[in-house]
Curated annotation (Swiss-Prot):
This is Small ribosomal subunit protein uS15c. GO terms for biological process: translation. Its main location: plastid. The lineage of its organism: Eukaryota, Viridiplantae, Streptophyta, Embryophyta, Tracheophyta. PROSITE patterns: RIBOSOMAL_S15. Component of the chloroplast small ribosomal subunit (SSU). Mature 70S chloroplast ribosomes of higher plants consist of a small (30S) and a large (50S) subunit. The 30S small subunit contains 1 molecule of ribosomal RNA (16S rRNA) and 24 different proteins. The 50S large subunit contains 3 rRNA molecules (23S, 5S and 4.5S rRNA) and 33 different proteins. Belongs to the universal ribosomal protein uS15 family. HAMAP family: Ribosomal_uS15_B. Keywords: Chloroplast, Plastid, Ribonucleoprotein, Ribosomal protein. The keyword Signal does not apply. It is found in: Plastid, Chloroplast. One of its GO terms (cellular component) is ribosome.
Length: 90
């Protein structure tokens, strides 16, 4: 999980890192989710990490819903780059 290569992909119009962008925040949450998932495969009874994983999943879901509402094209690009599933719509 290389953070710097993805930062350059996200901020191709800007030369500086745009850490406040929705895409970067979703990217950081995705990395955290993957790390926690690997941790929980080894430590199945770590309930505090399970709670942290659920909270992080909820935060990422809210950010993705916001991005979908604001700009659907950027949402589609992001989920394809990060290789994550689309949101379930009600």
């Amino acid at each position: 999980m290389k953070k710097n290569s993805f930062i350059s992909v996200i901020s191709d119009e800007k030369k500086e890192e745009n850490k406040g962008s929705v895409e970067f925040q979703v990217f950081c949450f995705t990395n955290k989710i993957r790390r926690l998932t690997l941790h929980l495969e080894l430590h199945k009874k770590d309930y505090s990490s399970q709670r942290g994983l659920r909270k992080t999943l909820g935060k990422r879901q809210r950010l993705l819903a916001y991005l979908l509402k604001i700009n659907g094209v950027r949402y589609k690009e992001l989920i394809s780059k990060l290789n994550i599933r689309e949101l379930k719509t009600r």
